[in-house]
């Protein structure tokens, strides 16, 4: 039974909570000195869609912008760009992974681009659900995160868009940066060529989180290592044309040795090579064209026995190759009319070679025996994908800005042809207040790399289709104080069936676990209200406060089931204090309702020999709930300025008051005579983790 595609009474109640806040917020302005009006923006720079958050040195053209230098002073772990985004309303993730969820949607429903190229699963240590992103945070100069309602420029994703841009230092002189922390080292160098017409940058990282784990006494069975390197060279062909060449290589290895369990050895690599042409032939016409090649390789091997009895032998080798051409252009037809159009064509091939031998206990005719399961799958799917769009931004005489758009996407591998109409609108109510709204449909075809071959899948599913409904209000209360209110609803049909480990997500052999469950929702719905209040300053005290009331659920067999990262209530408080240009202190407190989880019980099965076997029974998916989560992170940053260099040191305390937060429970049977009870032990997230980092720039 699908969710009804209408505004539900609960959504109406959410609106009744939020809307009365607006006049109170606006009334507060009368007690403030009116801030100066912002400089006039060109129509192409105006933010029309709601649900847009930015990080960059440029402010004013992106709502709720945070500068890169400010982001660098906030508490963080691993200097990871994906982990840093968890502070944005609507974004959720646990301590172990960088793969954040957006308004109840998994990270695979997010489109990520770096300098114009689409990234595919851009994470290190995928056996730990992607512990870190393959992008070096200091290299990112600007980003936009669109948590919903994005325009027709973006296709083949149903939830969100993340645009990341790198840039060169303001100084044209060569520059070098070296960084060292407990978990890794990094280096970057920027130079120039062809006089002042060409610039290049090389960055490299090598991580050894296993050493940090040893120092913390956490785990002596994990041996993770990762590395990545990126290169960019820009050449100014003329004042109106710039050509850039880019390369990104990332790899990681993981060895897991557990006593009385099989050993895992995995190796992942990602390679991207692309060229980008950016053109501004005149003041009215602008565009870019990107030609890219990508290859992802997976080599995952496991061998041994559980309890020295149940054998396991696993070989999982995969490869994905893509060639893509994308071209987007915008034309200013008049000061009040902007036309954008473009296309993207992709050819992709993939390979799956999967072999499994697994022994399990089974009871047959009252006898406990060992049954062997085997799998031997070899697939070579391939296909082409094509998308095109057209959108027009119109400014009416009454200051209302409309952006209707239409998108078409074709995927030969799945046979999908999807037409997606979209509409965004922005109405400046005053120099300080803007009302925004968006509606549209969004289709996402299953990627060739997304087949769950270990679970027996050999055919791709049809495209998912989501409908977004969003309304938002942004108001500047004072020169450095702003308020944002948003209400959203996302309805999804043709939801793709998937396999979840509903009890323990973090298992190095997920496909053989008893909690591996096929979930085939008939529909899905996410809705909520978000409030963001922030005060930003270059000096002194700045802060941010946000609250989100949300619900994300799926319809399974006629029952509404919460999504795996459903967070009913989320609160985040952040504060920074710049004592002077040398010292900066920051704190971040995060709270959210406990995530859904799945309970386990045991039953006793009598055997012919008079003994009993404790059979594990996995309960309904996500029918239970974990305790609430909260933690405090702290960071202190100190800078030393020298004649030709700068040294920056930082000290972080992750989970400063050592809160025990849970990711789930480990279950075991306790047998007493003819009865069995279920014992559960908490599985913790990260404890108090101190870390130190040093960066030298010269």
Predicted features along the sequence, with ranges:
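Periplasmic N-terminal accessory/gating domains of Gram-negative outer-membrane beta-barrel systems
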Residues: 45-150, 161-168, 184, 530
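Membrane-embedded beta-barrel scaffold of Gram-negative outer-membrane proteins
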Residues: 288-292, 296-298, 428, 463-521, ...
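Gram-negative outer-membrane beta-barrel transporters
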Residues: 396-399, 491, 513-599
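Short strand-turn segments of transmembrane beta-barrel domains in outer membranes
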Residues: 130-133, 141-151, 158-191, 200-206, ...
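Structural signature of Gram-negative outer-membrane beta-barrels, strongest in the C-terminal barrel
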Residues: 320, 330-338, 344, 376-493, ...
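C-terminal beta-signal and adjacent terminal beta-strands/loops
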Residues: 582, 590-612, 627-631, 637-698
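Transmembrane beta-barrel wall of Gram-negative outer-membrane proteins
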Residues: 181-206, 219-253, 265-293, 333-337
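Surface-exposed extracellular loop regions of Gram-negative outer-membrane beta-barrel proteins
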Residues: 354-356, 363, 427, 431-470, ...
């Amino acid at each position: 039974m699908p969710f009804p595609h209408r505004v539900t009474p609960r959504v109406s109640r959410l609106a009744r909570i939020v809307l009365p806040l607006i006049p109170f917020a606006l009334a507060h302005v009368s007690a403030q000195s009116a801030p100066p009006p912002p400089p006039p923006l060109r129509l192409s720079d105006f933010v029309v869609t709601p649900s847009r958050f930015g990080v960059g040195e440029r402010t004013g053209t992106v709502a709720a912008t945070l500068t890169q230098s400010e982001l660098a002073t906030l508490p963080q772990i691993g200097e990871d760009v994906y982990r840093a985004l968890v502070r944005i309303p609507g974004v959720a993730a646990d301590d172990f992974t960088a793969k954040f969820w957006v308004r109840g949607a998994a990270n695979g429903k997010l489109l990520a681009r770096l300098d114009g190229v689409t990234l595919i699963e851009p994470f290190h240590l995928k056996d730990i659900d992607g512990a870190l992103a393959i992008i070096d945070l200091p290299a990112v100069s600007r980003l936009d995160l669109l948590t919903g309602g994005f325009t027709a420029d973006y296709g083949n994703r149903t939830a969100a868009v993340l645009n990341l841009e790198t840039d060169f230092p303001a100084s044209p002189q060569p520059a070098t940066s070296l960084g060292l922390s407990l978990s890794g080292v990094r280096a970057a160098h920027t130079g120039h060529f062809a006089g002042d017409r060409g610039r290049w940058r090389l960055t490299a990282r090598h991580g050894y989180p296993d050493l940090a784990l040893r120092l913390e006494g956490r785990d002596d069975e994990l041996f993770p290592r990762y590395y990545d390197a990126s290169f960019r060279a820009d050449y100014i062909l003329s004042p109106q044309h710039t050509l850039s060449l880019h390369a990104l290589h990332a790899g990681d290895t993981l060895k897991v040795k557990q006593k009385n369990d099989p050993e895992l050895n995995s190796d992942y690599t990602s390679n991207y090579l692309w060229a980008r042409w950016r053109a501004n032939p005149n003041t009215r016409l602008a565009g870019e064209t990107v030609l890219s090649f990508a290859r992802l390789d997976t080599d995952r091997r496991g061998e041994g026995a559980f309890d020295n009895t149940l054998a396991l032998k696993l070989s999982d080798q995969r490869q994905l190759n893509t060639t893509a051409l994308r071209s987007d252009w915008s034309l200013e037809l008049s000061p009040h009319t902007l036309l954008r159009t473009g296309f993207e064509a992709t050819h992709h091939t993939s390979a799956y070679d999967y072999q499994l031998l697994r022994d399990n206990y089974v009871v047959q005719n009252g006898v406990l025996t060992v049954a062997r399961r085997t799998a031997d799958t070899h697939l070579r799917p391939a296909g082409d994908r094509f998308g095109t769009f057209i959108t027009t931004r119109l400014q009416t005489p009454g200051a209302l800005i409309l952006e209707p758009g239409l998108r078409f996407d074709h995927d030969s591998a799945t046979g999908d042809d999807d037409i997606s109409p979209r509409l965004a609108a922005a109405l400046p109510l005053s120099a300080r207040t803007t009302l925004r709204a968006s509606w549209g449909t969004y289709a996402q075809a299953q990627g060739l790399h997304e087949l769950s071959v270990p679970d027996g899948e050999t055919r791709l599913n049809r495209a998912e289709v989501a409908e977004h409904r969003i309304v938002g209000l942004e108001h500047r209360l004072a020169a450095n104080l702003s308020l944002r209110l948003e209400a959203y609803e996302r309805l999804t049909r043709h939801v793709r069936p998937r396999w979840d480990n509903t009890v323990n997500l973090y298992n190095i052999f997920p496909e053989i676990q008893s909690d591996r469950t096929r979930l085939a929702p008939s529909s899905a719905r996410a809705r909520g209200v978000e409030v963001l209040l922030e005060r930003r300053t270059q000096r002194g005290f700045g802060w941010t406060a946000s609250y989100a009331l949300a619900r994300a659920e799926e319809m399974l067999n006629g029952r509404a089931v919460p999504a795996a990262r459903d967070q009913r209530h989320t609160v985040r408080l952040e504060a920074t204090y710049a004592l002077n240009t040398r010292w900066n202190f920051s704190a971040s407190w995060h709270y959210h309702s406990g995530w859904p989880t799945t309970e386990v019980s045991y039953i006793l099965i009598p055997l012919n020999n008079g003994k009993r076997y404790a059979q594990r029974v996995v309960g309904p998916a996500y029918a239970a709930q974990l305790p609430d989560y909260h933690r405090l992170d702290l960071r202190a940053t100190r800078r030393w300025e020298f004649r030709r260099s700068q040294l920056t040191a930082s000290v972080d305390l992750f989970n400063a008051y050592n809160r025990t937060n849970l990711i789930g429970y480990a279950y075991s049977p306790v047998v007493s005579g003819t009865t069995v009870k279920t014992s559960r032990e908490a599985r913790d997230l990260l404890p108090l983790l101190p870390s130190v980092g040093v960066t030298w720039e010269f």
